[in-house]
Regions:
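Active-site neighborhood for divalent-cation/phosphate handling
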Residues: 87-111, 122-131
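Glycine-rich phosphate-binding loop plus the immediately following alpha-helix
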Residues: 128-174
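Short beta-strand-loop/turn "lid" adjacent to the catalytic site in phosphate-handling enzymes
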Residues: 52-91, 103-104, 187
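Conserved small/polar residues in nucleotide/adenosyl-binding loops
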Residues: 203-206
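Conserved ATP-utilizing enzyme core subdomain
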Residues: 160-200
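Short N-terminal binding/cap micro-motifs at the start of the first secondary-structure element
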Residues: 11-15, 23-24, 34-37
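Gly/Thr-rich phosphate-binding beta-strand-loop-beta motif of the actin/hexokinase/Hsp70
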Residues: 1-20, 109-124
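Short, well-ordered amphipathic alpha-helical segments that serve as non-catalytic structural scaffolds
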Residues: 38-53
Length: 206
């Protein structure tokens, strides 16, 4: 049995492969070693992934995820090894490499990721050969859900948009200004929270 994972900061899509055939797809929360500790990743794997896996041992895991830099990938590999019944290799790569391989195959090209965060690279057909650090939603991640949500919330709370839009926004997401401040500055995963606010209902602004 082989596991392949594609993970952003908000969600992870898992595919279980048996004898070369995908047999099950599983969804869990995002696993990002840049924002989460080894223990937090283990907890998510144990509680959300393990109960949904078919019985048996896992021969290999191929994990492509946000935050899986060479420095942080070992954190993820250890968490997986300590949480799942694995007898083979655990490979952890960046989600950017997954996007490049999926988009370009064996050809050279530019690939981009746009989700809770954002990233881009130049790919030579085998590996990523040039990449500018996205820097996260505070310093970078331009165009991402977290940054769009941050800009929208900032304009709303500073009364840069009409009272009608502000009222519609707070009603749609069932939030107050103090609750937003608390979620951004005091609660974990403000990037996920801000990204969840970016899709303001079009009916609210027309």
């Amino acid at each position: 049995m082989i596991l392949i994972a594609d993970s952003g900061s908000t969600k992870t899509d898992w595919c279980v492969i048996l004898n070369g055939t995908p047999i099950k797809r599983i969804g869990t929360k995002g696993l990002n070693p840049f924002f989460q500790s080894e223990e937090e990743i283990q907890q998510e794997l144990t509680h959300s992934l393990l109960p949904q896996l078919p019985e048996g041992t896992i021969n290999s895991v191929y994990f492509y995820g946000a935050g899986c830099t060479p420095e942080k990938a070992p954190v993820l590999r250890r968490a997986i090894a300590d949480s799942l019944p694995i007898v083979g290799n655990i490979k952890a790569y960046s989600d950017m490499l997954a996007a490049a391989r999926g988009l370009c195959g064996h050809e050279a090209g530019i690939a981009c990721v746009l989700g809770t965060g954002s990233n881009s690279c130049f790919y030579d057909g085998k590996e990523i050969v040039n990449n500018i650090s996205p820097l996260g939603f505070i310093l970078g991640d331009e165009g991402s859900g977290a940054v769009l949500g941050k800009l929208l919330v900032g304009d709303i709370l500073k009364n840069q948009l009409s009272p009608a839009i502000k009222e519609a926004f707070l009603k749609q997401f069932d939030l107050t200004a103090p609750e937003i401040i608390d979620r951004v500055y005091r609660q974990p995963f403000p990037n996920r929270f801000l990204a969840s606010l970016s899709p303001l209902d079009r009916k609210s602004v027309v």
